[in-house]
Amino acid sequence: MASETAAFDAVNAKYIGEVGRGELIIVDKNGLRRKQLYQPEESLPCVFEHIYFSRPDSIIFGSPVANSVIRREFGRQLYRIHPTKADIVVPVPDSSNDAALGYSDESRIPFEFGLIRSHYIGRTFIEPTQTLRDSKIVRKFNPNRAVIDGKRIVLVDDSIVRGSTM
């Protein structure tokens, strides 16, 4: 079991489907069984999964994350609410890439990778202190000077946990 399909791809496993609301999945020597414990009245998928945690090569809640309509629409809406003049739109990689693309699409301001992310530094929001979070952030992102120097930049960040990267 996994919260997104990329985990299955990594081990060449078959994706069967999502765990339903109110459903229990039992895997034992007899195989896999599904049991509906209760029927929830309303479906409320985790917003963090869709806009923050999920990898772009996954399917969650029945929809591909890549070119996520939700993530791109956030960027489009951001431009509509806060239009500005700039030379480039830069995401804080990787989870805000789609939102930055949406901002770029709506504004017609070119999208550029002006920050390079180290994939050796993990999630920063889980660190227990702000000092540790700040230390990891400095090591996690490096400005791409060839892209950003002398430019007016719209920096798009979707960090909704602590807002530390800004």
Model-derived regions: residue spans:
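Generic non-transmembrane alpha-helix signal with a bias for helix starts/N-cap capping motifs
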Residues: S96-N97, M166
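Hydrophobic, well-ordered secondary-structure elements that form the walls
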Residues: L78, Y103, V156-I160
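N-terminal segments that mediate ammonia production and transfer
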Residues: M1-S96, S104-N144
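PRPP/pyrophosphate-binding module of the type I phosphoribosyltransferase fold
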Residues: K136-M166
